[in-house]
Amino acid sequence: MKIAFISQPFGDMNPHHQSSSLEIWTYEVASRLCNYDDCDAIVYAREDDRYPKIEEHKGIQYRRVSLGLDEKTNRLANTTERILSYPRQKLPVFAQQFYYQNYIKQVALDLRDQDCDIAHIFNFSQFAPVIKEHNSNLKVVLNMTCEWLSQLDENVIKRRLQSVDQVISCSNYITHKIQQRFPAYADRCTTVYNGVYIPDSNSTNEERFQSEEENKRLLFVGRVSPEKGVHDLLQAMHKIVEACPDVQLDIVGPTISLAYEYLVMISDDPTVSGLSSFYTKGLVRHDTYFKSLKASLEPDVANRVNFIGQVPHADIMCFYQHADILINPSLSESFGISLIEAMANGRPVVASRVGGMQEILINGETGFFFEPGDADALAEKTITLLKNPDMRKSMGMAGRQRVQELFTWENVTQDLLLQYSRIVDSED
């Protein structure tokens, strides 16, 4: 079986160093597939002067194609969209057929010579018909890590799904939304959870749970963006600091908000669409969220909050190992990578009860849930854990066990192989 993974047309896709979650996912899965005698993997990515157009690494062949005029065309379309200020548009620029059309057409044409069985694309449903047009015998897998299929124009998505043989989502939360909206395609939808690296237990720094002298450290890992609920976390910090004056909060992640069009503009959830107040309107959408967060901090809290910024993924593990609790206050979350990363390192989690995170955390066993946007409840659950080291340790151990059972890269690869085999063996 030969699988072609078609990367989203941005990011590095460096085989020697992965940064984004999809780059990590692709590398971890493709490299494991290549360990099977009857599997080969190709990864398509955008052309980059730093890397050769074709190279191999750990059995994976990387093939890079030019974007041509794609980026100029997309910038012009985005500018036009923002000038017109479409309210609640269900087919924004990123979901249009022309979006990165040169990229996907080049991939589709190259695929004709690669003798692949499966083309595995991510999130951009408009790529599926292009692949099928030039490769009618190729099976197309659409991997969704967001809610776009249930948020974008229903008729447009329905037509595109005709070119998709299997829809794989990162959580049952996403899968069920797609099945409810498109019942005719329900049997083509399934869930394959994300995976995580699980360090040796000797590397997880469990002695922190026995120390009463060290300052307690809270950790947030993710984009500093309105939908991640960082404003609720900082509001909760006032009560947390009052109860535990020695606490520190590390906020690790890029301080650039998610594009307004990608989520807030198309969401049917009033809590999420209400985040539009954090975005400016007009031709240029100034990102004011990070500045507003820093301005909201009172002095007694400000010196307890550390904005670390973006760090290489390999270095994030160090933050987990020196943390006591992970907090994820997201208002929208398809899965919750930070939860399984923290749990893999034996750390308890305090998370909002939203999206795919409800399938990861077991309330009262591996951490605590709180209702999204409830800063008081967030503070209460966090303080409970901070004041109880035995509870932190037992929940951390339970979380690590849960990750070992459900969220290993080996599980991901085996689940995918099962789906691949099913559609390849099925009759058209």
What label would you give each PLM region?
Residues 348-351:
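Short hydrophobic beta-strand element within catalytic cores of glycosyltransferases
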